[in-house]
């Protein structure tokens, strides 16, 4: 792209963005800076030959961390340095739900948000600490969340909400903002990824307020990761070693081959995402042999370091272009990820944590796992059943009939026992009775127009069912 056209595009964009009164001056300048970086064609690819596997000093094995201090006073002092931040910008639309994803019921009538609040309440009660909860909303979830958090008014935790940035979608043809062309509804805008957490925390005034209260670290996680509970060993390690940033990573399985990984690159620890990998090395990137770990998006970051880097405008994370279409108009969303910020912080590390700290619920197949006898809930934490000897969870594949939460729940009188299950595939018009037990490899595929009802109390082990006759 010729520089002149890039310059013209940018000046046209600036004058259009200046007229968008729905967003703040901070958001306008943040957006213009992001687009300018994108147009300058900053190199996104890495030089493959410079990639090194991180050592145990850089990616610390969890089992080498020092034990948590014994005394409850020491633990209280540790916890009083902590803030928990949940990324709450996503909607439950992919699972057929309206409103924020965090209000989907996970188990025992409790939502993601209920479980998070119970966990922190439990910590604060046990140790007399004051760990606040921050929710970073997007413009899509803000209004609903404000109403939802009222139900926690009587809890012993402070709950704060703030909004991540709101940026205009760019029309690909002329590089002008969609809202300035009359799309003033929500479709004209987008939240620019969780990388915007850092400036948003600062612009909201929350960052300075937390620092003035003596808070030192923020533990950030997706609100749908049920494994992301406060870990005192990790917090203790970071405080003792003055690490400004920590990313929790965990060993890859074949399901995670596209996940970002940590590398050592030119003397710093860096996140490597599949989008940055040159085409000829994508196969190598996906191999579990060379890149053994992936990013859980559980992050621990020092608050003063965030302040220093935001004020210096130093957090220039890799830009992720996300093309979309709105009513036939091709648009572009430029996004950044919080994990990519790792290379800007001093003494940044990864910690290789057990898989139990990564339990995301992205689809109803995940919901089946966490609602089953594979897990129990204790003090808001989802604990895996020790009766399951296989460290990996069964693979679950559910057809489109189960995609929406309401349909999924309607098709199970009760969630089957799956402690001894290896894999399950269910497609078509299938209904489950109560007390069903599934073991080994089970496939239930109802052909079009055929209804399959699994009777109450059925035990199905290593079986393929293609119709009622197979039961």
From Swiss-Prot:
Gene3D superfamilies with a match to the protein in the record: Hexapeptide repeat proteins, Spore Coat Polysaccharide Biosynthesis Protein SpsA, Chain A
GO BP annotation list: UDP-alpha-D-glucose metabolic process
Key word Lyase present: no
Localization per Swiss-Prot or TrEMBL: Cytoplasm
Amino acids binding substrate: 89-90, 194, 222-224
Catalytic activity as recorded in UniProt: alpha-D-glucose 1-phosphate + UTP + H(+) = UDP-alpha-D-glucose + diphosphate
EC number: 2.7.7.9
Pfam families: UDPGP (PF01704)
One GO CC term on file: cytoplasm
First-tier enzyme category under EC: transferase
Residues reported to bind UTP: 87-90, 101, 164, 193, 224, 362
Keyword Iron-sulfur: no
GO MF entry, a single one: UTP:glucose-1-phosphate uridylyltransferase activity
Keywords assigned by UniProt, alphabetized: Cytoplasm, Nucleotidyltransferase, Transferase
Homology family: Belongs to the UDPGP type 1 family.
Its job: Plays a central role as a glucosyl donor in cellular metabolic pathways.
Official protein name in the record: UTP--glucose-1-phosphate uridylyltransferase
Species per Swiss-Prot/TrEMBL record: Astragalus penduliflorus (Mountain lentil)
